[in-house]
Amino acid sequence: MGKTREEAMRGIEGQRRAIREHIEKYNSYPHQYDKDFALKTIRRCQGEIRTLKSQCNVSIDSSWEDDWNP
């Protein structure tokens, strides 16, 4: 059975919040290895968003965080 929209949105909003935090970190880090770590976290969160959307029984609109790229 799929997730309800409310269940999916709770998870998606948490992932989007983490993406926003790591974008700030990405932009402030001076070293590439730190940027790579932040980018890895962002990509993982974006994957979680895709999974949550696919498990939901209704369509969920995309947000800029879902596809952010540096």
For each feature predicted by the language model, list its residue ranges.
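Mixed-charge, polar/low-complexity N-terminal
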Residues: 1, 23-24
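Amphipathic alpha-helical coiled-coil segments
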Residues: 19-20, 26, 42-65
